[in-house]
C-alpha cells in the first residue's frame, strides 16, 4: 500500500464507517481531516476535526479552505456523509425527500466542486472515493436515498471522465448492509432482524466498517492509477444473486446443498 503522508479529507467522520476510515488512514501515516455535522469532539483519530453541513455551500467551502490552510493540499477526498429515511414513498414528506437528496447528492457535489479545483491546481492529481450503496442499484427501501445514490454513481462517472487527464481519479465504493452504530436502535427493537438479513447475503454475514475502509484504501491508493469511473461493491455478494430465492426453488432437490 502506498503511504505518502497524504492529506485525506473524510466527511461523515463521526459515524460508524467514518470513524474507522479516520483510524485506518491515520494508521497508514496519512494526515486526516474529519468533517461532520456533529460536534468536532465526536471525530476521532484525525489531525483536524471540523464541524460543517456538507449540503451547505458556505460551510463546506470554509471547511475545505481550513483543511488546506492547516494540513496542506488535499490528496484524497472520501465522501462518506449520508443518511436514509426509510419512510414509505407514499408517506414521505417533501422536506424529507429534499433532505436526503441534498445530503447525499448535493453534499457530494459540493465537496467535489470545491476540492477538485485545488487538486487540479497542485498538479499531481488525486483520488476521490464516493461512498455509494447497493440501494443505488436495487430497491431496498429509502426511495430518496436510493435515488440520490444512483445519481451519485453517474456524477462519479462524469467527473472521472472530465478530470482523468489531470490525474484525478473518481470512484464509488458501494457497501451492502454494514453493521454499525446506526443499526443499533433497529436491532434493539427487532433482535432477530440481523439474522434474517444475513440470509440474503451469499457470504452469510453482514459487512463491517472495516470491510468498507479496506476497499476505500484500495481505491485511494495511487498505485491503482488505472482505476477510475467505476464502482467497487462491498456487498457480500448481495447483487450477484438471491440465496433465499435459490433455496426456495431447489428446496425439494435433495442433491442441492446450500
Swiss-Prot record:
Q: Which domain of life is it from?
A: Eukaryota
Locate the residues binding NADP(+): 17, 53, 80, 113, 145, 149, 178, 180
Q: Which UniProt keywords apply?
A: Cytoplasm, NADP, Nucleus, Oxidoreductase
Family, per entry: Belongs to the short-chain dehydrogenases/reductases (SDR) family.
**Under what name is this protein listed?**
Uncharacterized oxidoreductase C922.06
Q: Which SUPFAM superfamilies match?
A: NAD(P)-binding Rossmann-fold domains
What organism, scientifically named, is this protein from? Schizosaccharomyces pombe (strain 972 / ATCC 24843) (Fission yeast)
Provide the GO MF annotations for this entry.
Answer: 3-oxoacyl-[acyl-carrier-protein] reductase (NADPH) activity
EC number of this enzyme? 1.-.-.-
Q: Tell me which InterPro entries the record gives.
A: NAD(P)-bd_dom_sf (IPR036291), SDR_fam (IPR002347)
Q: Where in the cell is it found?
A: Cytoplasm; Nucleus
> Catalytic site residues?
145 (proton donor), 149 (lowers pka of active site tyr)
A Pfam family annotated for this chain is adh_short_C2
Q: Which GO terms describe its cellular component?
A: cytosol; nucleus
Q: Which GO terms describe its biological process?
A: lipoate biosynthetic process
